């Protein structure tokens, strides 16, 4: 049986870490639209924020990514979709949304040295870029699809990760996820 899990959330909320933990626990592959977009930004010689701004006037790039998510959602295999809009393009997925305090998000991202094309001089600069990027994405999704990505009704489960360890977030997700997938704990 193919299952889809749509993991979305705010920048710095821990989506990538959670996706990795879920992939290991459930033996599922991850498709990360954020990674695809970061690669495209690098290809175009832009920061992620610059690329998001660029996509505001070049919706064909968003559509390209969105079409990929839709196609992955139709594949006959189980997948974890790490994407802000997978909940919209894969309606049968378990839709999980992670929240985080903006200051904590900035601290997490500033301290993440794996983000090679997202380097900042300070937590404050990181915070400014995150705010601009969040606004850019919300605007694009509202203009292109008429949706509010912050509307809690879009999701099966919301978790505020601000004061939780990655393990605690994983544990909060597993019970409702297993119930949704029709699995019993311990299977």
Language-model regions, residue ranges each:
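Post-Walker A helix-loop "phosphate-sensing" segment adjacent to the P-loop in P-loop NTPases
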Residues: 24-31
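Small-molecule kinase domains that catalyze NTP-dependent phosphoryl transfer to phosphate-bearing small molecules
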Residues: 118-169
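Hydrophobic positions on the alpha1 helix immediately C-terminal to the Walker A/P-loop
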Residues: 18
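P-loop (Walker A) phosphate-binding loop of NTP-binding proteins
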Residues: 10
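C-terminal accessory "lid"/substrate-recognition subdomains
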Residues: 140, 158, 168-187
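Hydrophobic anchor at the beta1->P-loop junction of P-loop NTPases
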Residues: 7
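Conserved glycine(s) of the Walker
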Residues: 14
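ATP-dependent small-molecule kinase phosphotransfer cores
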Residues: 31-90, 103-107, 111-118, 124, ...
